[in-house]
C-alpha cells in the first residue's frame, strides 16, 4: 500500500472531494472504475456525474460514491456546478457526441479550477483545438500516444513523440 496511514479519528472531509464526470451509454464501466480509483487514491469523498442510465449501476457497484445525474439519459450534456469540489476529472466513457462537446466547452469556459482531462475529453479537445488555450491554469492532460498525436501532430518515431512532448 502506497498510502500514508490516516489518523484514527480523521474526518473524510479532510481528504478532498473529487468530482468525476464520466460514463455514458455502454460505457458505465468507465464511471465505476474511475470512481473506484479516486477512492483508492485516497479521496475522502467522491461524486460521480453520470447520465441518468448510470444511477442504478453506480449505486449497485459503488454505493460509497455519491451520484450527480445529468439531465440526459445516455450522455454527458450539462456540466454540474464545480463549486464544493477540491478536484475534478473528466473524460472516460463520455463519447464525443455534439451535445457532449458543447457541455465540455461550457465546463471549460465556466471554471477557473484545474481539471484533469482524460480519454474522450482529450478526443473532444483534439476536435476543438481552440479550447486548449482556454483550459484552466494548472489543468492536467493524460493522453496515451495516439491521443497525444491527435492533440498535436502525427509523428514518425517514438523519439519524435518524446521531443514533441517536451
Identify the function of each model-found stretch.
Residues 1-119, 123-141, 145-166:
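Small-residue (G/A/S/T)-rich helix-start motifs and N-terminal tracts that mark the onset
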Amino acid at each position: 500500500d502506497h498510502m500514508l496511514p490516516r489518523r484514527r479519528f480523521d474526518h473524510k472531509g479532510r481528504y478532498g472531494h473529487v468530482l468525476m464526470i464520466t460514463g455514458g451509454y455502454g460505457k458505465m464501466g468507465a464511471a465505476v472504475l474511475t470512481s473506484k480509483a479516486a477512492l483508492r487514491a485516497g479521496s475522502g469523498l467522491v461524486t460521480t456525474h453520470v447520465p441518468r442510465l448510470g444511477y442504478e449501476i453506480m449505486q449497485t457497484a459503488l454505493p460509497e460514491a455519491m451520484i450527480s445525474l445529468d439531465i440526459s439519459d445516455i450522455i454527458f450534456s450539462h456540466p454540474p456546478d464545480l463549486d464544493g469540489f477540491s478536484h475534478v476529472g473528466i473524460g472516460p466513457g463520455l463519447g464525443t457526441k455534439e451535445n457532449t462537446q458543447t457541455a465540455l466547452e461550457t465546463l471549460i469556459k465556466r471554471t477557473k479550477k484545474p481539471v484533469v482531462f482524460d480519454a474522450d475529453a482529450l478526443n473532444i479537445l483534439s476536435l476543438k483545438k481552440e479550447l486548449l488555450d482556454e483550459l484552466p491554469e494548472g489543468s492536467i492532460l493524460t493522453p496515451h500516444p495516439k491521443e497525444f498525436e491527435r492533440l498535436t501532430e502525427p509523428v514518425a518515431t517514438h523519439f519524435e513523440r518524446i521531443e514533441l512532448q517536451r
